[in-house]
Structures are given as structure tokens and as C-alpha cells.
Regions:
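Amphipathic alpha-helical elements of HEAT/ARM-like alpha-solenoid repeat scaffolds that form extended
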Residues: 59, 95-104, 134-139
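Leucine-rich, hydrophobic repeat-scaffold detector
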Residues: 120-155
Length: 155
């Protein structure tokens, strides 16, 4: 296990997709002493799935484990959420809503109702523009499997 690579992956596990600017921002925030070669190691690691020219997706099984690890460290989780939020501030609304669902599911007081409300907003946002139907279908196929496994039960 490479601690720097895992730390970087934990941050990126909260993202709907990882573009180069987000990868760089996450590295600088999570592992500032590491050089840019860490970004390349992540891009071509088994943690990355569907790596393309301009972005990649984090493997969904790995993302669940990485998110669980991050949940155990609230300060690191908050910092990671801020990295993702800042990087995707002007991203497609579906990306932002997906990331909000992920973030909500990791809150200590997460409940299924709040997550369901965000999922409904996500579906509504994606369905509003019928011209984007093929893009929406592709997005759903790629991102629905990446939603968090489950919302933690309430104590």
C-alpha cells in the first residue's frame, strides 16, 4: 500500500469524475510534499477506472472503501469535500448534485430521506433538457454504480 497514493485516492473518491485540474488540486491539498508523479501513478493505478483523455472515474468498489476510511477522519473528510467543491464549483449540475449525494451519505447524521431528496433533484436536473437525453443515459450508466453503497444507519 502506498500511503500517499491512498491519501490522494481518498480525496478523489468523493468526486463524480476526476479531471487533471482536480487531480492536481487534490494532490496539493492532500499530499503537498509529493510531486506530480503521484498524479501519474494515480491515473494509471487500479484505483482509476475508465481513464480517458480528459478525465477518469474512480473504481466504484475502491471508492466505497476509500470513503469509509475518510469517514473515520472528520477533519480530513471536510477538507476533501472542500477540494471537490472548489474544483467543481462551475461543473455540470448533475456532477455537483452527485457529489452532494456522496457528501451527504458520509455525514455522521446521514439519513435516507435527505439523500433521496438529493437523488430526486439529480434525476430532475438531468431530465430537464430532453436534447441531452443520450448524454444523460450515458451519465446514468457510468455514475449510478458509483453512488455510495448505502446511507449509514442512524444510531
Amino acid at each position: 500500500e502506498e500511503p500517499d497514493l491512498v491519501r490522494l485516492a481518498e480525496v478523489l473518491s468523493l468526486a463524480a469524475q476526476v479531471e487533471q485540474p482536480l487531480l492536481r488540486r487534490a494532490r496539493l491539498a492532500a499530499v503537498p510534499a509529493a510531486g506530480p508523479e503521484l498524479e501519474g501513478r494515480f491515473w494509471f493505478s487500479p484505483l482509476a477506472e475508465s481513464a480517458g483523455v480528459d478525465h477518469l472515474l474512480v473504481d466504484p468498489r475502491a471508492a466505497d472503501v476509500l470513503r469509509d476510511r475518510l469517514r473515520e477522519r472528520p477533519a480530513d473528510l471536510a477538507a476533501a469535500r472542500e477540494v471537490i467543491r472548489a474544483a467543481h464549483e462551475h461543473a455540470d449540475p448533475a456532477v455537483v448534485l452527485f457529489e452532494q449525494v456522496v457528501a451527504l451519505s458520509l455525514e455522521p447524521d446521514a439519513d435516507a430521506e435527505r439523500v433521496a431528496e438529493h437523488l430526486l433533484r439529480l434525476a430532475t436536473t438531468m431530465a430537464e433538457d430532453r436534447a441531452r437525453a443520450p448524454d444523460v443515459a450515458r451519465w446514468v450508466l457510468r455514475h449510478v454504480p458509483r453512488l455510495p453503497r448505502a446511507v449509514p444507519p442512524r444510531p
